Amino acid sequence: TGEKPFTCKECGKGFTQKRNLASHMTIHTGEKPFSCTECGKGFTQKRNLASHLTIHTGEKPFPCTECGKGFTQKSNLVSHMKIHTGEKPFTCTECGKEFAHKHRLLGHLKIHTGEKPFSCTECGKHFAHKYHLVSHMKIHTREKPFTCTECGEHFANKVSLLGHLKMHKGEKPFTCTECGNSFTQVSSLVSHMKIH
């Protein structure tokens, strides 16, 4: 009949069974009665604990039918499937660019808003994305965790390493439209363009 006689007094959501209401109430109380025996992390719902346990067991019960890659959670599989379908349901209202995932759209929107909520505690420079701040911080710590397997040179970030690897491979993907000279890195092309 679709009747939901058990109503949450906090938010008004209705449930068909009393036990479902009791389970729902943990959202409001903050109670986490289901604990992981491996790491102690608490969960409001039993199903969330069951899903979490696959991290420790290494079990990946949700395989992709296209490429065979396994996932611990169904939601991750659903998200992954967009790679194969090409589905991009999230559209930027400013420029029309489409995204497969909502978090990618939200990150992109910062280009239009100019929002840079992540600031460096060392020099005060602001960044739109946390991963850019993390990468930037390596300048101050002088940390260079990315190593070239060809020559052993170390780099602060993956982008710099990948740019460097083009030198070993002889790749020069950045070409000057004025004279045809090619460069391994875009920064070299930008410097070169100043002579024209």
UniProtKB/Swiss-Prot annotation:
Keyword Transcription regulation included in the entry's annotation: yes
Main location: nucleus
Protein's cellular compartments: Nucleus
Zn-finger segments (C2H2-type): 6-28, 34-56, 62-84, 90-112, 118-140, 146-168, 174-196
Described function: May be involved in transcriptional regulation.
InterPro entries, per the entry: Znf_C2H2_sf, Znf_C2H2_type
Residues in coiled coil: none
Annotated GO MF terms: DNA-binding transcription factor activity, RNA polymerase II-specific; RNA polymerase II cis-regulatory region sequence-specific DNA binding; zinc ion binding
Family of this protein: Belongs to the krueppel C2H2-type zinc-finger protein family.
GO CC annotation terms, alphabetical: nucleus
Protein name, as recorded: Gastrula zinc finger protein XlCGF8.2DB
Keywords, ordered alphabetically: DNA-binding, Metal-binding, Nucleus, Repeat, Transcription, Transcription regulation, Zinc, Zinc-finger
